[in-house]
Amino acid sequence: MWGRRRKLRRLNDVTISTCHVSAKVGTRLVFDHDGKIIQKTPYPHPRGTTVSVKQLFSTLPVRHKEFQRNIKKKRACFPFAFCRDCQFLEGSPAMLPVQPAKLTPRSTPPHPCSLEDNVITVFSSVKNGPGSSR
């Protein structure tokens, strides 16, 4: 997976759900902490790819507690991976343990668009709060 020296996979649970434009059904891949696929199943998913990161720092209890304690300060530091066809979920349970039920989808501009457009869309939404636009 990604991260400093490709070790992010060891710090959390990673699931990738994807569906190609020509496919009738998507695929869900669940990875273990060594980066090996432990489950590959058909999954109803819209066109595109979603990367889910859960239990961030769960393998490092001290780091996990520090993360939970400082989540409000560190919130702006989580741009998450995004590409041309993806969504940004502001307030996912992994990010905000205080309010786990509040999810606000942030969609990137329609295809085709540049990486710069995606960054502007995601960060302007986070900076200006829920329901804001560029």
Swiss-Prot record:
Q: Name one GO cellular component term.
A: mismatch repair complex
Provide a GO biological process annotation.
mismatch repair
**Gene3D superfamilies this protein is in?**
Histidine kinase-like ATPase, C-terminal domain
Residue ranges of the TM segments: none
What are the GO MF terms of this UniProt record? ATP hydrolysis activity; ATP-dependent DNA damage sensor activity
Which family is this protein grouped under? Belongs to the DNA mismatch repair MutL/HexB family.
The extra comment attached to this record reads: Encoded by one of the numerous copies of postmeiotic segregation increased 2-like genes scattered in the q11-q22 region of the chromosome 7.
Name listed for the protein in its UniProt record:
Postmeiotic segregation increased 2-like protein 5
Organism, scientific name: Homo sapiens (Human)
